[in-house]
Amino acid sequence: GDALLAASIQRAGNVFLASRYESTGAAAPLPAYVRRSTAPDPGAAATTLQSAQHPIPSLGAVAAGVGHVYAEPDNDGRVRQIPLLLRYDSVGVPSLALLAVQHSLHLGLDDLRALDASEGLRLGGLNIPTNAGVMLRPRWQVSGDSAATFPTLSAASVLDGTAPAGSLKGKIVLVGEMTDAPGAAAARVEERLVHPVEVLAQAVSSMRLGLGVVEPAWAMPVTWLVLAL
């Protein structure tokens, strides 16, 4: 039950959970177990959202942190950028990917510093390229065939002990649904549909490997010029 799961999360000490944010709905203050993971208000340029759904208090209170998994596709349905900080309730809510990277580097959010708008964020000694809206544009890694871009294990193989010994040791482990059932959540990356946990993995990988795409300062005026033509 929830009590056993909460005890396991607390014992591990390295489990981060996700909240879901929406642009509509009734606003409510962040609960304390979410607010403790937040950063200072990132300003009006950051993505501002209206409502949120959080983990139940018994789990959120014992988690190492709670972050968001929000990613809004462009008009063509493709996900090209991910907000590393959302603006909600006058604070910056970090993405689950940012919390995972921060923890893997043995750092805290006190080590996160905003640089100039054109330079992004600095997490300890790691530079993370973002735009003024604190958006990361991952350099999407896509395998050349139908194979998964990142190693995957079924939950059943982990729980019953048939997963290879040590396969999770020293790794950032992301847990998420990867069903192909009709109606399952998916995002379009490049030319294919991927599950939200894969988008999360791409963001983590881009930050750790320094593979973010930097948008030059002249990109937006050029876009306007092309559209004007």
Model features per residue range: what roles?
Residues L99-A100, L153-S157:
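Short intrinsically disordered coil segments
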Residues T130-S154:
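Active-site Gly/Thr loop motif
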